[in-house]
């Protein structure tokens, strides 16, 4: 399990919904340098029967690093690769600790935006589409899910169907195509 969509970089080796080993660090922009050594330090070099990767939304570069690494390892090891949403990971961790039927996850999306998505507990599922809203337009009420980034260890709690291992950016890229005149 690989999580690089936020300021954190975390990995976990999970077997039968049980975390065998994990590592996590808040790295900011250092995902590319930290990810592969973290995986290599897991038992068996981190080799697994399947790879799950956080597809975002979150850090543009962090998402690309995680998805590219997951795809490369999956190809090299001959194992399937699947994705999940960083917001679903946060919701799963919340439900594991709280007796609530629903939660709305709000994370900082950068560029003055926040990503917002509600989830239901059983089965863990989205109850509305991902929204990108200006940071000053959000009023958060009710229970607080916490300020920390998602952690790969919580992937064992996910029950939703996996996503294809493709980035979920949450907004259009800042780079714009140039048109020759």
Please name every model-derived segment.
Residues 1-19, 26-37, 44, 79-181:
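Oxyanion-binding and handling regions
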Residues 22-27, 55-59:
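A short glycine/serine-rich beta->alpha loop
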Residues 52-81, 86:
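DPxDG-like acidic metal-binding loop motif
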Residues 33, 37-40, 67, 71:
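N-terminal, well-ordered alpha-helical segments
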Residues 12, 24, 50-52:
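Short, conserved beta-strand segments within well-ordered enzyme catalytic domains
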Residues 45-49:
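Short helix-loop-beta connector
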